[in-house]
Amino acid sequence: MPVDLLAIAAHRDDVELTCAGTLLKAAAQGYRTGILDLTAGETGTRGSADLRAEEAARAAEILGVAERRNAGLPDAHLHNDEASRRVLVEEIRHFAPRVVILPFPVGRHPDHRIASELARDACFLAGLARYPAGGTPHRPHKILYALAYREDPVKPTFVVDISAEFERKMAAIRCYASQFDGARNAGEIFPTGQDLYSLIETQNAHYGSLIRTRYGEPFFTHETMAVDDVVALGVQSM
């Protein structure tokens, strides 16, 4: 059954770190949500692929996603090649999402950068009727980039208020004890002296402050956003 919102990321836990609150909010609004992890995280320094699979299953239950799948691509060896694109095209056709969340295409981790490019290309190719892959052709309507933990001077296109979802987001993140307990950095998150959980809260509080709420998750789109009612625009200017 198709999902309304699909989050794609390189590793189990990437989605939880960047957009778990948004997935929780969408599910509460009645939308079907899904997660596609591209790798099993088998080359990670901490934990193991099997343990991370168990942690991901527990996190998915908290997030209330309709389905979580793994593409089985090689961790630390992602490539935007024909074989990988075909795998992702079949996954996208399986989920048939309207909106897709991808990693931001700039970052220190090679897998994150390549996952973004690979998944975006696959979203286009999945709509080609004659592209040689399984499934019914489908092209997502919208691509969003999760912008959390960036140091680039990129202003979010919009920020989702996750104040009501923040505690459950943290509960999902804490499922990955093998990765985060005692850690001070992860993925795109550089160490600051805080423990990782405190640092995540600081980041989410920062983005929440930009829209005058307690916690938020930032997103970027290449397209200009349409507004139907300028009088109803949020975020106070004065």
What is each model feature region?
Residues 1-95, 232-235:
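Active-site rim/loop-helix segments in enzyme catalytic domains that contact anionic ligands
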Residues 1-6, 81-238:
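Metal-dependent de-N-acetylase/amidase catalytic core
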